[in-house]
A protein has these predicted regions:
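Amphipathic alpha-helical linker/stalk segments
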Residues: 2, 57-85, 127-134
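Helix-turn-helix
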Residues: 10, 14, 18-52, 56
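Hydrophobic alpha-helical connector segments
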Residues: 56, 70-96, 140-153
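Amphipathic alpha-helical packing segments from all-alpha helical-bundle domains
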Residues: 63-70, 113-138, 147-151, 187-195
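Phosphate/oxyanion-binding loops and surfaces in catalytic or ligand/nucleic-acid-binding neighborhoods
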Residues: 64, 93-97, 111, 156-164, ...
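C-terminal peripheral helix-coil segments that are non-catalytic and often amphipathic
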Residues: 128-136, 140, 156-208
Length: 208
Protein backbone atom coordinates (compact mmCIF):
# COMPACT_ATOMS: atom_id res chain seq x y z
CA UNK A 1 0.00 0.00 0.00
CA UNK A 2 2.82 2.39 0.86
CA UNK A 3 4.29 1.75 -2.58
CA UNK A 4 1.01 2.77 -4.21
CA UNK A 5 0.74 5.99 -2.19
CA UNK A 6 4.35 6.93 -2.89
CA UNK A 7 4.09 6.06 -6.57
CA UNK A 8 0.84 8.00 -6.96
CA UNK A 9 2.51 11.06 -5.52
CA UNK A 10 5.52 10.64 -7.78
CA UNK A 11 3.25 10.73 -10.83
CA UNK A 12 1.29 13.70 -9.48
CA UNK A 13 4.44 15.65 -8.67
CA UNK A 14 5.78 14.91 -12.14
CA UNK A 15 2.58 16.30 -13.63
CA UNK A 16 2.74 19.40 -11.42
CA UNK A 17 6.23 20.07 -12.71
CA UNK A 18 5.51 19.50 -16.40
CA UNK A 19 1.92 20.65 -16.85
CA UNK A 20 2.45 24.44 -17.13
CA UNK A 21 4.88 23.96 -20.02
CA UNK A 22 3.25 21.00 -21.77
CA UNK A 23 -0.46 21.21 -21.11
CA UNK A 24 -2.95 18.37 -21.09
CA UNK A 25 -2.51 17.07 -24.64
CA UNK A 26 1.28 16.73 -24.57
CA UNK A 27 1.43 15.37 -21.05
CA UNK A 28 1.32 11.73 -22.05
CA UNK A 29 1.57 8.73 -19.76
CA UNK A 30 4.96 7.94 -21.26
CA UNK A 31 6.26 11.45 -20.51
CA UNK A 32 4.94 11.23 -16.96
CA UNK A 33 6.51 7.82 -16.43
CA UNK A 34 9.91 9.07 -17.60
CA UNK A 35 9.74 12.13 -15.33
CA UNK A 36 8.54 10.08 -12.35
CA UNK A 37 11.07 7.31 -13.09
CA UNK A 38 8.27 4.76 -12.98
CA UNK A 39 6.59 2.51 -15.53
CA UNK A 40 3.60 3.34 -17.72
CA UNK A 41 2.02 0.10 -16.57
CA UNK A 42 2.12 1.27 -12.97
CA UNK A 43 0.32 4.47 -13.97
CA UNK A 44 -2.55 2.45 -15.43
CA UNK A 45 -2.64 0.36 -12.28
CA UNK A 46 -2.89 3.42 -10.04
CA UNK A 47 -5.28 5.62 -12.02
CA UNK A 48 -8.50 4.78 -13.86
CA UNK A 49 -7.57 7.02 -16.79
CA UNK A 50 -5.79 10.24 -17.64
CA UNK A 51 -8.77 12.44 -16.78
CA UNK A 52 -9.07 10.87 -13.34
CA UNK A 53 -5.35 11.43 -12.83
CA UNK A 54 -5.43 15.07 -13.95
CA UNK A 55 -8.42 15.76 -11.71
CA UNK A 56 -6.27 14.62 -8.79
CA UNK A 57 -3.35 16.73 -10.01
CA UNK A 58 -5.51 19.85 -10.27
CA UNK A 59 -7.13 19.21 -6.88
CA UNK A 60 -3.79 18.74 -5.12
CA UNK A 61 -2.19 21.75 -6.77
CA UNK A 62 -5.14 24.04 -6.09
CA UNK A 63 -5.30 22.89 -2.48
CA UNK A 64 -1.69 23.93 -2.07
CA UNK A 65 -2.09 27.22 -3.93
CA UNK A 66 -5.62 28.24 -2.91
CA UNK A 67 -6.38 26.14 0.15
CA UNK A 68 -6.67 29.35 2.17
CA UNK A 69 -9.76 30.33 0.11
CA UNK A 70 -12.50 29.20 2.47
CA UNK A 71 -15.59 30.74 4.12
CA UNK A 72 -13.72 31.06 7.42
CA UNK A 73 -10.89 33.12 5.85
CA UNK A 74 -9.90 35.97 8.23
CA UNK A 75 -13.16 35.39 10.09
CA UNK A 76 -12.01 37.39 13.13
CA UNK A 77 -11.57 40.59 11.09
CA UNK A 78 -14.34 43.13 10.38
CA UNK A 79 -16.22 42.41 7.12
CA UNK A 80 -14.58 45.16 5.08
CA UNK A 81 -11.12 44.17 6.27
CA UNK A 82 -11.90 40.53 5.45
CA UNK A 83 -12.74 41.53 1.88
CA UNK A 84 -9.56 43.58 1.63
CA UNK A 85 -7.43 40.72 2.91
CA UNK A 86 -9.14 38.20 0.65
CA UNK A 87 -8.49 40.18 -2.52
CA UNK A 88 -4.90 40.90 -1.54
CA UNK A 89 -4.25 37.21 -0.86
CA UNK A 90 -6.05 36.28 -4.08
CA UNK A 91 -3.85 38.72 -5.99
CA UNK A 92 -0.68 37.23 -4.48
CA UNK A 93 -1.79 33.66 -5.16
CA UNK A 94 -2.85 34.45 -8.71
CA UNK A 95 0.45 36.19 -9.41
CA UNK A 96 2.33 33.09 -8.26
CA UNK A 97 0.06 30.76 -10.22
CA UNK A 98 -0.06 32.59 -13.58
CA UNK A 99 1.73 29.78 -15.52
CA UNK A 100 -0.75 27.23 -14.16
CA UNK A 101 -3.84 29.37 -14.61
CA UNK A 102 -2.98 30.44 -18.15
CA UNK A 103 -2.25 26.84 -19.16
CA UNK A 104 -5.56 25.72 -17.65
CA UNK A 105 -7.34 28.51 -19.52
CA UNK A 106 -5.79 27.28 -22.78
CA UNK A 107 -6.82 23.69 -22.05
CA UNK A 108 -10.30 24.85 -21.04
CA UNK A 109 -10.64 26.67 -24.35
CA UNK A 110 -9.69 23.37 -26.01
CA UNK A 111 -12.56 21.68 -24.14
CA UNK A 112 -10.43 19.68 -21.73
CA UNK A 113 -13.21 18.81 -19.30
CA UNK A 114 -11.05 18.28 -16.21
CA UNK A 115 -9.37 21.67 -16.65
CA UNK A 116 -12.72 23.36 -17.24
CA UNK A 117 -14.29 21.79 -14.17
CA UNK A 118 -11.33 22.58 -11.91
CA UNK A 119 -11.27 26.21 -13.05
CA UNK A 120 -15.03 26.54 -12.65
CA UNK A 121 -14.89 25.07 -9.15
CA UNK A 122 -12.17 27.51 -8.09
CA UNK A 123 -13.91 30.56 -9.56
CA UNK A 124 -17.24 29.55 -8.08
CA UNK A 125 -15.69 29.00 -4.65
CA UNK A 126 -14.18 32.49 -4.69
CA UNK A 127 -17.37 34.06 -6.02
CA UNK A 128 -19.56 32.56 -3.30
CA UNK A 129 -17.23 33.72 -0.53
CA UNK A 130 -16.94 37.24 -1.97
CA UNK A 131 -20.70 37.46 -2.53
CA UNK A 132 -21.38 36.68 1.13
CA UNK A 133 -18.82 39.27 2.22
CA UNK A 134 -20.34 41.94 -0.02
CA UNK A 135 -23.82 41.15 1.30
CA UNK A 136 -22.55 41.57 4.85
CA UNK A 137 -20.73 44.82 4.06
CA UNK A 138 -23.49 46.41 2.00
CA UNK A 139 -26.83 44.65 2.59
CA UNK A 140 -28.66 47.56 0.96
CA UNK A 141 -27.29 46.64 -2.47
CA UNK A 142 -29.60 44.85 -4.87
CA UNK A 143 -28.39 41.57 -6.36
CA UNK A 144 -27.56 43.40 -9.58
CA UNK A 145 -25.59 46.09 -7.75
CA UNK A 146 -23.70 43.47 -5.76
CA UNK A 147 -22.79 41.61 -8.96
CA UNK A 148 -21.57 44.86 -10.49
CA UNK A 149 -19.37 45.55 -7.48
CA UNK A 150 -17.92 42.04 -7.58
CA UNK A 151 -17.28 42.23 -11.32
CA UNK A 152 -15.49 45.56 -10.86
CA UNK A 153 -13.21 44.06 -8.21
CA UNK A 154 -12.48 41.02 -10.38
CA UNK A 155 -11.70 43.02 -13.50
CA UNK A 156 -9.77 45.77 -11.71
CA UNK A 157 -7.73 43.65 -9.31
CA UNK A 158 -7.33 40.10 -10.61
CA UNK A 159 -7.60 40.12 -14.40
CA UNK A 160 -4.81 42.73 -14.88
CA UNK A 161 -2.43 40.32 -13.14
CA UNK A 162 -3.03 37.71 -15.82
CA UNK A 163 -2.72 40.28 -18.60
CA UNK A 164 0.47 41.86 -17.27
CA UNK A 165 2.22 38.53 -16.77
CA UNK A 166 1.10 37.22 -20.14
CA UNK A 167 2.17 40.33 -22.04
CA UNK A 168 5.56 40.22 -20.33
CA UNK A 169 6.09 36.52 -21.05
CA UNK A 170 5.26 36.78 -24.74
CA UNK A 171 7.16 40.07 -25.05
CA UNK A 172 4.55 42.06 -26.93
CA UNK A 173 5.11 45.28 -24.99
CA UNK A 174 7.91 47.80 -25.68
CA UNK A 175 11.00 47.46 -23.52
CA UNK A 176 10.26 50.85 -21.98
CA UNK A 177 6.97 49.52 -20.61
CA UNK A 178 8.09 46.11 -19.42
CA UNK A 179 9.59 47.20 -16.11
CA UNK A 180 6.78 49.63 -15.20
CA UNK A 181 4.26 46.87 -15.90
CA UNK A 182 6.15 44.41 -13.71
CA UNK A 183 6.26 47.01 -10.95
CA UNK A 184 2.47 46.86 -10.89
CA UNK A 185 2.78 43.25 -9.71
CA UNK A 186 4.77 43.96 -6.56
CA UNK A 187 3.18 43.33 -3.18
CA UNK A 188 2.89 47.06 -2.50
CA UNK A 189 1.31 47.81 -5.88
CA UNK A 190 -1.21 45.00 -5.51
CA UNK A 191 -2.12 46.11 -1.99
CA UNK A 192 -2.62 49.66 -3.23
CA UNK A 193 -4.89 48.52 -6.06
CA UNK A 194 -7.00 46.51 -3.63
CA UNK A 195 -7.28 49.51 -1.30
CA UNK A 196 -8.31 51.79 -4.16
CA UNK A 197 -11.08 49.47 -5.29
CA UNK A 198 -12.39 48.80 -1.79
CA UNK A 199 -12.53 52.54 -1.08
CA UNK A 200 -14.11 53.32 -4.44
CA UNK A 201 -16.87 50.75 -4.00
CA UNK A 202 -17.47 50.87 -0.26
CA UNK A 203 -16.21 54.32 0.79
CA UNK A 204 -19.13 54.84 3.18
CA UNK A 205 -17.97 51.79 5.12
CA UNK A 206 -14.35 52.88 5.50
CA UNK A 207 -14.97 54.57 8.84
CA UNK A 208 -16.64 51.52 10.32
Amino acid sequence: MSLDISSSQQFILAAEKLYPQMGYQKLSVRVLAVEAKLSSGLFHHLFANKDDFMAQVFAQHFQRAFGWLAPEFAEDAPPLERLRRLYFQAALSLRDEVPWITRMMIDSADNVATAQQSMQDLVLREFRIVREMVREIAPQLSDEQAMQAISQMQTSILLPILAANTFNRIRVVPDELRQPILQQLTDDALAQRVDWMIKALFSAKETQ
